[in-house]
Amino acid sequence: MCIRDRSIRAIISAPPGPVVPDGYDPARRAYFQQIGGYGFAIGAPESIEVKTTTISECYRRGLVRFRYGLASRIRAKSPEQTAGLQAALLTGVRSYIPQEQTDALRVAGLAHVLAISGLHMGLLAGGSYFMATLLLAMIAPLSRRYDVRKPAAIIGALAATGYLLLSGASVATQRAYIMAIIVFLAVILDRRAFSMRSVAVAALITLMFHPEALISVGFQMSFAAVAALVVVYREWHDKRGYVPRIGFRQKSWSWLSTLTVTSFVAGTATSGFAVLHFHRVANYSLLGNLFAMPIFTFLVMPAALAALIALPFGLEAIPLAVMGWGLSLLLKVSVWVATWPGAILHVWAAPAWIIGLLGLAFLLATLGQGLRRYLGFGLAALCFMIWSQTPRPDMRISDAGQVAFWDNKDEAILYVGRKRSDRYGREQFMQKAGLVNGEIKRYQDELAQCDKLACRFEVRGKQVSVVHHPSEVPLECDTADIVILTKRQAGPVARRGCAAKLLDERVFRTAGAHDVYIEDGAIELRPANKKGRRERPWS
């Protein structure tokens, strides 16, 4: 017996499905995380003895407790403004970051700072490697007889392993860790460290343990960035050949140009996948990274490494203060960039299959040579052309029969039945349409003709009836194009005799919420819980 589990009275329900078609699916994520349900407690927890706990479970829970305890210690010793960010960068616990800081970093194109990935792993493990190399090189008898880079690579690998465990081992962190280990192995074996073969091995190992990560935004963006950087810098290195010794001014210019190229290449490689998943573009991302990355690279992460080294000795206060000062500068940069006009552009969602086509285009552009590379760029351009012609949904019908639709004349106005209901689903619908700042009004106040039994209004030339009682369904079916019954089922007779599109409790229970597209007089209903999803084990 290594731990005490706890018993608690709670109300638990199955993980919910997507609230919009092709939207984020919490049930799928919960399935692969082995989470059977979500809920909330209705009583105080009680400790119980559990004798069936495995060694691996003991280790996992102990590590979680250690991480959260360390996060609390770091927050207590850090400046108040940046304490949450410092805990997130050192332990992966992001729940203490204020929302306004997250929003500012996202708008400035610096959200990647929050996710522990290749940048963080490279700086921390690489910093450990170079520091170990320097210290070992100072030992003259050792450096004269042996290649000190190899034991330094082992130290770097150990530092990377410790950071992986400490940070929570997300998929992006695992990818970065695998790449770091491959690089250190290459140093030990006197091989080329950075190559597309290394990227492919890292991808295969990641997918071997987490095959579900293939369609996740973290996997796609992290591998897109590292693959593009490897290709660009490998070709740059091969073409420039011998580089003569240069002075400080030339070195400064070379460093600035390298930082610019790195930010541009990584940003360009990941932009398509980021927009596909998040439906927004940070217009000043390149400038934000040019201003912020020197602070993060040369101040924040070295101080973070020093803080981790000093933690066992209780000497972390000074490194954490330096780290906090650097992060405060970075936050000032992000807030400054976020206030520029047009800093964020919201775009509407693309069809789900576009991401597969864009992935193929990216592979051709990075792995191909000559004509195949140009074919990849052309295919990417085709993806964006198709995307630009994709229609927005005209109306949303939640799984409880709540309706939201755009004004026929002004798409900046969204009409709803009740402002307080279906908030999350409505936000996802607005984000999918690329109109997150739309004004919300009640259709009962302006457009609809309502009585005790139903509300009737027009959307893009089609008559819609929101019915509150099954007895009214036959009458509304004769005059409306879409009939929505908010309570109970319509019954088999009414369903067969209805010429309109009829949605009732039976449809909502099976197919969930719906997006409605009206194009050239035709009505298309797209359910959130599609037939293909209903056949999945997490449905």
Task: Explain the meaning of each model-derived region.
Residues 39, 93, 97-285, 347-392:
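Hydrophobic alpha-helical transmembrane segments in multi-pass membrane proteins
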Residues 47-61, 107, 272-291, 295, ...:
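Membrane-interface amphipathic/re-entrant loop segments adjacent to transmembrane helices
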Residues 43, 407-412, 460, 519-520:
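Short acidic-glycine loop/turn motifs at beta-strand connectors
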Residues 430-539:
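Cytosolic C-terminal regulatory domains/tails of membrane transporters and channels
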